[in-house]
């Protein structure tokens, strides 16, 4: 038994193939091909009805930005790549901030140890940093 997602994929592939065949028929239309065209269009409508029936079996949230990519003629898979690139950039920024805070803490502890050695010793003992 196929999963609902696989079933939807199969129906979408059949729909796309139907559209491709209709495009071929229409691009070189001959009057004797009217019956075939009508059958293909009916098959297209039936396919859309089948796809519509499957919508309740699958809960997929597609970010609106993906549709923007499609509207702009871009590959929707680039959206995933762009999201990963943005996450990587943000991760590098956060890592830089963490490293800066660690250096600041280290320098601060060093300076405070020189200025207030007794208090810093007590602080380190309480924190368990020794």
From Swiss-Prot:
GO terms for molecular function: transcription coregulator activity. Keywords: Activator, Nucleus, Transcription, Transcription regulation. One of its GO terms (cellular component) is mediator complex. GO terms for biological process: regulation of transcription by RNA polymerase II. Pfam families: Med10. It is found in: Nucleus. Belongs to the Mediator complex subunit 10 family. Component of the Mediator complex, a coactivator involved in the regulated transcription of nearly all RNA polymerase II-dependent genes. Mediator functions as a bridge to convey information from gene-specific regulatory proteins to the basal RNA polymerase II transcription machinery. Mediator is recruited to promoters by direct interactions with regulatory proteins and serves as a scaffold for the assembly of a functional preinitiation complex with RNA polymerase II and the general transcription factors. Component of the Mediator complex. This is Mediator of RNA polymerase II transcription subunit 10. It comes from Anopheles gambiae (African malaria mosquito).
């Amino acid at each position: 038994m196929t999963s609902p997602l696989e079933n939807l994929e199969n129906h979408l592939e059949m729909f796309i193939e139907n559209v491709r065949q209709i495009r071929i028929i229409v691009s070189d239309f001959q009057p004797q091909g009217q019956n075939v065209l009508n059958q293909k269009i009916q098959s297209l409508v039936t396919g859309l009805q089948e796809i519509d029936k499957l919508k309740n079996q699958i809960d997929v949230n597609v970010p609106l930005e993906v549709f923007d990519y499609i509207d702009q003629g871009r590959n929707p898979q680039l959206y995933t790549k762009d999201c990963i690139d943005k996450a990587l950039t943000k991760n590098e920024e956060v890592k830089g901030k963490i490293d800066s805070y660690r250096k600041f803490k280290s320098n601060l502890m060093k300076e405070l140890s020189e200025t207030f050695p007794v208090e810093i010793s007590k602080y380190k003992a309480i924190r368990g940093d020794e």
